[in-house]
């Protein structure tokens, strides 16, 4: 790990707004962006496309090591376009089905190990904003600033419902709430890199906060680090 490069680690459960907040912060700071969840979504998506069973740990490990993926800076809520094997999959990998698959493969030790160095390679000058579920605990334990961003399951389901409805999807909010609760349990109970705040993380509950308020709150913490914002 390149500890000389400043970085901000943002962890939290599904639907807490990590991706949107991280993208906005990366643009504000002029730093690189790592959406670690996208890597697991990409792996799950690629596995299905290549006929690899999501329980086949060895095959998934090989696939993870050879993912042909590019992250291209762009406007929008996630701050980047994602290209897999030459095709843009930015929106395709954001479905609930792919998310469930990502949570499944993320529980496999060999998969997490295969993607670990790939994630750490994103830490380059002038800095990095990384979001995920184990950024501050496993991937970048030396990050000088760690945020654990959360919100109530009900609020996260509401946000996801509005997001999907805006895209024209036919979704049921109660079903989304159940999926979020199931994923929370799966992510927090897995044996490897379970979802939990780092001991030195700042806890931030965004249930009653706007995205803008969350960003400004984190920016104030960045200023305390002496970073140029």
UniProtKB/Swiss-Prot annotation:
Gene3D superfamilies: P-loop containing nucleotide triphosphate hydrolases (3.40.50.300). It is an enzyme of class 2 (transferase). It is found in: Cytoplasm. It catalyses: CMP + ATP = CDP + ADP; dCMP + ATP = dCDP + ADP. The keyword Kinase applies. Its main location: cytoplasm. Its EC number is 2.7.4.25. This is Cytidylate kinase. Belongs to the cytidylate kinase family. Type 1 subfamily. InterPro entries: Cytidylate_kin, Cytidylate_kinase_dom, P-loop_NTPase. SUPFAM superfamilies: P-loop containing nucleoside triphosphate hydrolases (SSF52540). ATP binds at residues 12-20. GO terms for cellular component: cytosol. Pfam families: Cytidylate_kin. GO terms for biological process: nucleobase-containing small molecule interconversion; pyrimidine nucleotide metabolic process. Keywords: ATP-binding, Cytoplasm, Kinase, Nucleotide-binding, Transferase. GO terms for molecular function: (d)CMP kinase activity; ATP binding; CMP kinase activity; dCMP kinase activity.
């Amino acid at each position: 790990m390149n500890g000389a490069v400043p970085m901000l680690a943002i962890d939290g459960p599904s639907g807490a707004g990590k991706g949107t907040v991280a993208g906005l912060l990366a643009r504000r700071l002029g730093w690189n962006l790592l959406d670690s969840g996208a890597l697991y979504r990409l792996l799950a998506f690629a596995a299905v496309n290549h006929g690899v069973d999501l329980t086949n740990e060895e095959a998934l490990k090989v696939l993870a090591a050879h993912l042909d993926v590019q992250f291209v800076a762009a406007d929008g809520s996630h701050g980047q376009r994602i290209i897999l094997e030459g095709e843009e999959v930015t929106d395709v990998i954001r479905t609930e089905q792919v998310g469930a698959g990502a949570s499944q493969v993320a529980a496999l030790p060999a998969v997490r190990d295969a993607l670990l160095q790939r994630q750490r390679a994103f830490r380059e000058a002038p800095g990095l904003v990384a979001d995920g579920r184990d950024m501050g605990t496993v991937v970048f334990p030396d990050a000088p600033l760690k945020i654990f961003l959360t919100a109530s399951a009900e609020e996260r389901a509401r946000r996801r419902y509005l997001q999907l409805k805006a895209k024209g999807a036919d979704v049921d909010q109660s079903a989304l709430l159940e999926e979020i609760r199931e994923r929370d349990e799966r992510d927090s109970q897995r044996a490897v890199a379970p979802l939990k705040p780092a001991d030195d993380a700042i806890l931030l509950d965004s249930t009653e906060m706007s995205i803008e308020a969350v960003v400004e709150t984190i920016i104030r913490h960045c200023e305390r680090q002496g970073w140029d914002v």
